[in-house]
Amino acid sequence: MAEPTLPIIEIRNVSKTFQLQGQTIDALKDANLRINQGEFVTLIGASGCGKSTLLRIIAGFEKPTSGEALMWSKPITEPEPQRGMVFQDYALFPWLSVRDNIAFGPTSRGVPRAQARATVEHFVDMVGLGRFADAYPHQLSGGMRQRVAIARVLANDAEVVLMDEPFGALDAMTRERLQEELLEIWARTKLTVVFVTHAIEEAIFLADRVVVMTPGPGRIESDNPMLLARPRDIASPEFNDTRRVMSGKLHSHHGKKAA
């Protein structure tokens, strides 16, 4: 019998509570999740189900109230370059150019100048921003800014890319184009991606596995392998069948909570 694969990320019985105006808010309750190296996993659920909280715990920005988050079996206690975060609002330095935003991580880590420069140029080209390397964030479209944010994480030598609804504020055409580009980058780099979304179609289109979370407090309701071949056609009967199944799983539990 084969040995089980060691997960790159493991969430063990994680609960998280917050204090808000004198009340205790249960954001997560006994969450368990294993993510293998190279997987693309999407987290989906209604607002307030703890998706972003779970992502922040994996990033090291938040600590669990109980349970533990692990990377390669070692406790996650603080942010580290191995886990890079991409936010919906880009989180770029407005006073730095595209090139300097991407160079910030390697430079801060003491990477030799020539090596850092080569790394930056590699990822600038990978995200298609070679012509805009000297531009500033305010001179870029939303989609271009998000490409910079992705390149910045990649240039910092991340093994795990954590994405918190990164395309949620973009128009439909730009969002679809960036989904395709993200899958191309993932295929080339073999990185592990954990992607938060509230859109069922986006979750199915991108993921190896779609993890459904439920609110009040947030729990892992189901973990669903996506068996659709890549590249995926959102207009195909197979995709629509999967969308109906996933929609049913998502909304049936929410209906029970509301009843």
Where are these regions (language model features)?
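Hydrophobic anchor residue at the start of the ABC signature
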Residues: 86, 150
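Conserved ABC transporter NBD signature motif
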Residues: 67-79
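Conserved signature/switch motifs of ABC ATPase nucleotide-binding domains
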Residues: 135-138, 156
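The feature captures the beta-strand-to-loop junction immediately N-terminal to the Walker
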Residues: 44-46
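Catalytic Walker B motif of ABC-type/P-loop ATPase nucleotide-binding domains
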Residues: 161-164
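Short coil-to-helix segment of the ABC ATPase nucleotide-binding domain corresponding to the Q-loop/switch region
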Residues: 96-104
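Helix-to-loop junction immediately C-terminal to a conserved catalytic motif
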Residues: 59
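Conserved ABC ATPase "signature" region
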Residues: 103, 107, 112-132, 184
